[in-house]
From Swiss-Prot:
Name under which the protein is recorded: Carbonyl reductase [NADPH] 1
Residues of the active site: 194 (proton acceptor)
Keywords: Acetylation, Cytoplasm, Lipid metabolism, NADP, Oxidoreductase, Phosphoprotein
GO cellular component, one term: cytoplasm
Keyword Phosphoprotein listed: yes
Subcellular location: Cytoplasm
Keyword DNA-binding assigned: no
EC number: 1.1.1.184, 1.1.1.196, 1.1.1.197, 1.1.1.71
Subunit text: Monomer.
Record: residues binding substrate: 140
Species for this entry: Sus scrofa
Principal subcellular localisation of the protein: cytoplasm
Binding site for NADP(+): 10-34, 63-64, 90, 194-198, 231-233
Modified residues (Phosphoserine): 2
Gene name, Swiss-Prot/TrEMBL: CBR1
Length: 289
């Protein structure tokens, strides 16, 4: 494979929104599209399904909580393509409301995948992103809701323009510890484990965008967080109003921003629109339009 061939990669892509993103990228992206999944059999089955539609994704195994798995993917991308043009971090988990797993265990497992896993992928793959590359971190307005349920002190920290990656990791670890000690409400946290992890993903995106601006200004890489909306998936449930295909629209829009685009960068985007970080979803100007 020539290093001149462009390549896009989607994590957690064997079903749901990730699968729909891969399908759209296969149709619209000028280059190879790599579908990744933790489970090889499910990932390969997803590739076969898309091949039956006349599309040609590639498959590579990826478990975002396994550093060895991430590094094997890095080696593949370096060898086959000399880097990466588009990264969509979609892999995530959520516990259903009626799940009997103890709250602190839910917090630990959700944080391990949604925040720490996404961070590990970014740590390893961002250095491979080529000039004019695009990075999309799939977050959620559930993170915005959770932010608005946090104490003013925590909100101030998460909205800070100067928060560091180390400070953010410390806060995410503190949330998990506070749930173990039964004091997370007393310490000012939301009750939504999923929401808190998505606060982390959104703030991490702002931090990485800032670093790219400072360290690789001439490369015109654009990195954003987005919310696909409430989507009918295993995670979103059958009552959600959006199909996975509609949910894929905003991530794909950000993944395919034209090469001469100056933005958005470091923003939170939903319905293809930039919204101010931390503003409650009910206040988005088009919600009641």
């Amino acid at each position: 494979m020539s290093s001149n061939t462009r390549v896009a990669l989607v994590t957690g892509a064997n079903k749901g929104i990730g699968f729909a993103i891969v399908r759209d990228l296969c149709r619209q992206f000028a280059g190879d599209v790599v579908l990744t999944a933790r489970d090889v059999a499910r990932g390969q089955a997803a590739v076969k399904q898309l091949q039956a539609e006349g599309l040609s994704p590639r498959f590579h195994q990826l478990d975002i909580i396994d550093l060895q798995s991430i590094r094997a993917l890095c080696d593949f991308l370096r060898k086959e393509y000399g880097g990466l043009d588009v990264l969509v971090n979609n892999a995530a988990i959520a516990f259903q409301l009626d799940n009997p797993t103890p709250f602190h265990i839910q917090a630990e497992l959700t944080m391990k995948t949604n925040f720490m896993g996404t961070r590990n992928v970014c740590t390893e793959l961002l250095p491979l992103i080529k000039p004019q590359g695009r990075v999309v971190n799939v977050s959620s307005t559930e993170g915005v809701r959770a932010l608005n349920e946090c104490s003013p002190e925590l909100q101030q920290k998460f909205k800070s323009e100067t928060i560091t990656e180390e400070e953010l990791v410390g806060l995410m670890n503190k949330f998990v510890e506070d749930t173990k000690n039964g004091v997370h409400r007393k310490e000012g946290w939301s009750d939504s484990t999923y929401g808190v992890t998505k606060i982390g993903v959104s703030v991490l995106s702002r931090i990485y965008a800032r670093k790219l601006r400072e360290q690789r200004a001439g490369d015109k890489i654009l990195l954003n967080a987005c919310c696909p909306g409430w989507v009918r998936t295993d995670m979103g449930g059958p009552k959600a109003p959006k199909s996975p295909e509609v949910g894929a629209e905003t991530p794909v829009y950000l993944a395919l921003l034209p090469s001469d685009a100056e933005g958005p960068h470091g923003q939170f985007v939903t319905d293809k629109k930039v919204v101010e970080w931390g503003v409650p979803p009910e206040s988005y100007p088009w919600v009641n339009a």
